A protein has these predicted regions:
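Long, highly charged low-complexity segments
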Residues: 3-12, 23
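Conserved non-catalytic scaffold segment of RNase H-like nuclease domains
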Residues: 15-19, 24-141
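Short, glycine/acidic-enriched loop or turn micro-motifs at the edges of active sites
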Residues: 23-27, 168, 215
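A short, structured active-site edge motif that brings together acidic residues
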Residues: 57-60, 159-173
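Active-site-proximal helix-loop-helix substrate-binding element of RNase H-like nuclease domains
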Residues: 68-105, 166-214
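Acidic, Mg2+-coordinating catalytic module of metal-dependent nucleases/exonucleases
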Residues: 131-140, 144-145, 149, 184-229
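Substrate-recognition/cap helix-loop segment adjacent to the acidic, metal-dependent catalytic center
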Residues: 141-164
Length: 229
């Protein structure tokens, strides 16, 4: 998909690669590691941007991963979400009754998850793309998680060419919207967002990484064209 956008030009500066992405996480002790990764990659040629098809991948758990995957932060069918909720509550209250119902196995078997499973080696190429791009994120956890996973597997991680972190504007969002949460902020300002970018980056449910990345890049584009203070 090709598009022209002065806001995207401003976000990228002199660079020709924009990457908006979001993660949901595996939790291992105090560490956060990427579980679901989704978003969009844009490349500039002349005065036009080419937007990739949205990407979405699911990565394997780290060794020793606890069997807990929250439905709230997972891209699954409603039926699997219900099973995850039951298993999560069982694990919390009566783990002796779990038997063979491993939460991670249930999650991986879901029809919205299984087709997108990738080996850990996928991170190597994604880390390379990060190092060649200006990235758009909400908060620093996503980049930290990718960096930690790369370190754990011996992959090279280079700092992005630039970082547009919309969380830097959380005080302004809270003042205007009474919330700094991504979905709440988006709903608050969506009437002011660029119509072309809304079409290019459609919104689904919150905590779907592709949808969250779409909200983040639209908000980032709005920020560079607005005095939000």
């Amino acid at each position: 998909m090709k598009l022209r956008s002065a806001a995207l030009d401003l976000l990228a500066g002199k660079h020709a690669s924009l990457l908006a992405f979001d993660c949901e996480f595996w939790h291992k002790g105090q560490a956060f590691l990427p579980r679901e990764v989704g978003g969009y990659h844009l490349t500039r040629t002349g005065d036009a941007w080419t937007r990739s098809a949205p990407f979405f991948v699911v990565l394997p758990p780290p060794a020793g991963q606890l069997n807990r995957v929250s439905s709230k932060f997972s891209t699954t069918t409603p039926a699997t979400a219900e099973v995850l909720d039951i298993l999560e509550e069982t694990e919390r209250s009566a783990p002796e009754f779990l038997g063979d119902r491993d939460i991670v196995d249930v999650y991986f078997a879901d029809s919205k998850v299984k087709p997108y499973l990738k080996p850990t080696s996928w991170l190597k190429g994604f880390a390379k793309l990060i190092g060649e791009s200006v990235v758009v994120v909400k908060g620093d956890m996503d980049l930290k998680a990718i960096k930690s996973a790369c370190a754990a597997h011996g992959f090279t991680f280079k700092t992005p060419l630039g970082i547009v972190d919309i969380a830097a504007h959380n005080p302004e969002f809270t003042k205007r919207c009474k919330t700094a949460k991504l979905e709440g902020t988006y709903d608050c300002i969506k009437k002011e967002l660029d119509a072309g970018l809304k079409k290019a980056f459609p919104i689904g449910k919150a905590h779907d990484p592709v949808s969250d990345a779409a909200m983040a890049i639209q908000i980032a584009a709005w920020l560079v064209q607005k005095d939000v203070k």
